[in-house]
Amino acid sequence: LENILSMITVQTNLYFNKKNNTISVGKQKSQETIKSTRTKTVNGTVTDQNGEPIIGANVLVKGTTNGIITDINGNYSLANVTEDATIQFSYIGYQTTEVKANSKELARIILKEDSELLDEVIVVGYGVQKRSDVTGAISSVTSEKLNSTPSSSLGEMLRGQAAGVQVTMSNAAPGGSSNILIRGRRSLSGGNDPLYIVDGVPMTSIDDINSNDIASLEVLKDASSQSIYGARAANGVILITTKRGQTGKMKISYNTYAASQSIHKNFEFYNGEEWAALRKEAYYNANLSYDETDCFRGLMLDVFKSGEYVDWEKLMISSAWQQKHDILIQSGGDKTKYALGLGYFDQNGMVPNSGFQRLSGRLNIDHKLLKNLTIGTNFLYTKSWKKTADGSFNSFITMPPLAKVYNDDGSLREDVTEAGESHYNPLWNIDYSNNKSQTDRLLINFFVDWKITKDLSYRANGSLNTRTVHSNTYQGTKHTTGRNNNGKATAGTSFSNDYLFENIVNYVKDFNKNHHFDATFMQSVNVIEWKNLGINGTGFANDDLTYNAIGSANEYGTPTWELSDRKLLSFLGRVRYNLFEKYLFTFALRVDGSSVFGKNNKYGYFPSGAFAWRINEESFLKEAKLLSNLKLRLSYGAVGNQGVTPYKSLGLTDRYLTEFGDKTIIGYLPGTELTNPNLKWETSTSGNIGLDFGFFNGRINGTIEYYNTKTTDLLVTKSIPSSLGYSTQTVNLAEMKNNGIEITLNTTPVKIKDFRWNVNFTFTKNKNEIKKIDGQVDENGKPLDDVNNKWFVGYPMNVYYDYVFDGIWQKDDDIANSHMPTATPGSIKLRDVNNDNQITADDRVVMQRDPKWIGTVGTSFNYKGFDLSADLYISHGGTIYNPYLTTFENGGDLTAKRNGIRRNYWTQNNPSNEAPAPNMTQAPAYISSLGYQDASYVRLRNVTFGYNFPRALISKAYMQSLRLYMTLSNFWTKTDVQAYGPEQTPGDYPEPRTVLFGLNVTF
């Protein structure tokens, strides 16, 4: 397109200028006759700000048709130029530059990009809007930023990219997912996941989306921007727009990388000698013989004598490869444009028999049927396979080091110690099991855009979004569990179908240059169906076909069949008004009717309003040259959470079986929960104040946000008198509050000829507090807490509740007169929190699990074709429970039956104050108090070094761009959490450290 327009400029009396996504055309000023005398030829090079030559740039004698375009190296040579002429240099996407014909600057012309931050166009839901006109709190993340993190989880790619968004890895195994919180937790039982909208289609998960298909991602954080999605938007909204076709010659992009994954940790397990000493001490403290022949039974004694200990961590965990390949083809003409994306992702697991693969294909088409009528489609299909090792991760690495993995003939041993302590070889069960799942997603979206008049348009949007998950497991005839049933297989399939149809009307009108008005009206119907089928069978002739032979099982369990649906009828009205390009107003009302609500509360109403003032456009700041942007934003509104389980308002029945002779009669009776016809949505009402600022032509820019959110009518299960015939009822009673501050700062400290240095910061602080649970109070009128769910009025929702570790009792302590008079030296000392000289349930304390604040620091350097970037992620505060320090399964109870984290435990000769005395027969009392650790951490998430080859060098190979890069991901972590990752319990699959080599090429 650029080359064509450049040629037209040279050969006609027209000029072209691009602003945002609009190309304007105009007629040149009246031509002047080129004087035949005193003319010359001017030569030079046209480059961008990075020194890259611009191919096809327009070089024109102003006011004439005498012009030329630059060659493949950005060079030009323009003849017949008069001494007093002005040379005009232009290229679409760059600011036009004018230079006198006698200037020395002609030798090298540098064009600046014509893309200020304020003119960025972002998606706001049911339309787009210039960044400068936005009144709500919206964060944007580019595709390049997302793809800087090597992961199959789009949520993990989003971590640290937007203030107000907290991402935690729920499962780092291949194909694992992440939890995303936007501005804190807002529901006790209705879910806290945001709503995802992909090309206008709602989705419950984005892990099936190929990140390379994404053009932009927006996070809607305040009620004014969220309210257009009504009863589903209380936890925030993430809008994803995928790449579309473009007019002009075909563009082919290929992106690939290969990566090596490995574990990292900040703790050590006991080695063989240390574990043997621990076991002896545990026997001694249990008043058992700690002679070697008594302590080390079975194979343990042989290994102890030989010193050939097993390092289970090294045996079970190894480096693993990960690769990704993406192809994107974009093209189009005057009528039809298309984008075709194909992707393949493959991640091997670091433990045996685990891995994840995904194939994806996306096709987006836009076709102009008539001058004012466009149709299009978005098509997505993904298929993924996930393989999971049998057993939990902690069972792999906490086997005793005094063990034998293999028999003398090289075959696997089943019991690695033969000590009678159920030390089953983890490799054994992996060999005799098969656990796989397959996920298929199909999304088809059709739309029609009709430009009825200059100001009025209509869009019809219909979509089908289906997802099918097949989950299969098999425990073979030799598996330690499966052998009890001569093999056991399970097979389950879940189906979800999401149907959406929308009618959208837009009206846009400019009343002279000072008044801009636009209105959007929408009506939609959304139906979601979910089905789940499950079956299990036992008794197999052999293990050859694993779960595929479930049809030939000898016995079957009771099949399961579940189904549910949701229906949503919605209406939306939104009005935006721009006065003098300085005063911006937005008003919206969404109405949702949901099938899951009670019959007395079928419809929810969610209004919002917002105002923004572009202060820098005021006359009193027009001359403030250092100030490039200053905008104040205010918003207030309500959004909902329809987290009601389908049919909950109607009441559920329980199945009962009755025997009549040789027949079984199935019947149904009302369940234990009373129906509630008043059941409705949870409502979050939120106010937001934001300040956008920019200095030095955008070299310093950022945003400060403060919000205050009150969520009412939270769903809780309330106990009711049994005299009613029921025990519980789900009601809208609880209340919660969130408030916080968010800061985003982007700076360019250095910007010179060939060198650029950028630094960016984000800061997020959220305070969450439960204000009310079920309305019940004690005899003093104090609200009652829900200890079972760990919900406490006046505290955050996500907490631990336990005793406080205060050291280890020593021989010289006056134990008899203490608050724990029955304790013994070497046992755990608890803190007497209320100072009543005894340990009771009242000494337990509430510990916040979520961080107090999170932040990022990023920097990037660009020198000619080289670039270097780094991102630091900080999570401060919060608590994590570490079972490696407390439980038997994780070797933390100091009974010396399994291996665990090396501890400085108490002995007669080592009166430690860190961990109690080991005991073979009894775990230390109150040992759970040892498991709570400060969850703060600092992590170097990504370091990337890359090189972009000069266009002049690669253009001969028909390349537009070529980039090679290396990335170190999760390379360094500083934390006190003794685990493989500061956000995971040690039994979870570890988050890997990754070394990556990648290539991006465009033709």
Pin down the residues of each PLM region:
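Extracellular/periplasmic, surface-exposed regions of secreted and cell-surface proteins
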Residues: K100, L146-S151, D193, D199, ...
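Glycine-rich, aromatic-lined ligand/substrate-binding cores of catalytic
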Residues: R849-Y881
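Short, small/polar-rich motifs associated with maturation and membrane association
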Residues: L1-R362, H367-L370, T374-T382, D415, ...
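Switch/connector loops and helix/strand junctions flanking conserved nucleotide-binding motifs
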Residues: R131-S132, I228-G230, G248-K249, I263-K265, ...
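C-terminal extracellular loops and terminal segments
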Residues: G155-R159, L733-K737, E779-Y800, V846-T856, ...
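Short Gly/aromatic-enriched secondary-structure transition segments
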Residues: E268-Y270, Q475-T477, I535-G539, Q776-D778, ...
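Conserved small-residue
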Residues: S253-K305, G534, V731, T748-R849, ...
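Extracytoplasmic gating/loop element in the C-terminal half of outer-membrane beta-barrel translocons
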Residues: L301-V303, S594, S875-L964, L968
